[in-house]
A protein has these predicted regions:
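Selective transmembrane helix interface/packing segments
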Residues: 1-249
Length: 249
């Protein structure tokens, strides 16, 4: 049983700035963002006050859900973060589920989660500076005593890194387990039907019967449920850190 798991493949190299590799992560991520943008435009065009369409009802439901999600976890003064949280959640969920279509999942590439985490880190830092000012923000690194400054800096940097690795680790571990289960069922099918005598056994042993249907059961968790939970947890951590950063020191 040979199992091989690789990183994001390089599709081509753009002949600019000495050659920029165009990876599957970039292509799939931008494709998902384009589809999300077109979907939002389709949902929100031709909005009405009377004779509301089903499309508008769905759009209002999604907006209300995102707004309520942010308000209930961060407070109403952070309502303006609802579009950002909804975008991160949608992008994370669809990026993880894109692997079901046979393309490379962007969330299986650590650079994707690191980019999101850096963006969240910038928002956290900006919120702290807005709340306490530059002086108060820098002074916060010396609390409660100045000797802890290096540890406070490390703790600050560790926040986005831990968010990225937690999300990446859970997605990749699910991919690895699903791949191992699929490969093991294929090997078991080959061994089981190979016990049949003659040409019938030789023919049936080449068809991975056990790999059809059974992996779908595990996919409900490792692909669908896990993808939803990882997107949900990443958004929860984002809201928690930003809300905490808005508290005056």
């Amino acid at each position: 049983m040979n199992v091989e798991i690789n990183g994001s493949p390089i599709l081509t190299t753009l002949p600019i700035f000495g050659g920029i590799p165009l990876t599957a992560t970039l292509v799939v991520t931008w494709s998902i963002m384009l589809l999300l943008t077109l979907f939002c435009i389709w949902l929100t065009h031709d909005l009405r006050v009377d004779h509301v369409t089903t499309r508008q009802t769905v759009a209002e439901f999604l907006v209300y859900t995102a707004q309520n999600f942010v308000d209930s976890n961060m407070g109403t003064r952070f309502s303006h973060y609802a579009p950002f949280v909804a975008a991160i959640f949608s992008l994370s969920l669809l990026s993880s589920l894109s692997g079901l279509l046979g393309v490379f999942s962007p969330t299986a590439d650590l650079s994707t989660e690191l980019a999101w985490a850096v963006l969240v880190f910038v928002l956290i830092t900006a919120t702290k500076i807005k709340t306490n000012g530059i002086g108060g923000y820098l002074k916060g690194y010396t609390q409660p005593i100045a000797v802890l400054t290096p540890f406070n800096i490390i703790s600050e940097i560790a926040t986005p890194i831990s968010m990225a690795f937690r999300h990446f680790g859970n997605i990749v571990s699910g991919t690895v387990i699903s791949t191992l289960i699929y490969a093991a069922l294929g090997a078991a099918s080959h061994a089981l039907f190979g016990l049949l005598p003659g040409a019938v056994g030789d023919l049936l042993s080449r068809i991975p019967f056990l790999s059809v249907g059974i992996p779908a059961v595990f996919s409900l968790y490792f692909d669908w449920f896990s993808s939803f939970m990882q997107a949900f947890i990443f958004c929860m951590l984002t809201m928690m850190y930003i809300a905490a950063a808005a508290e005056a020191d």
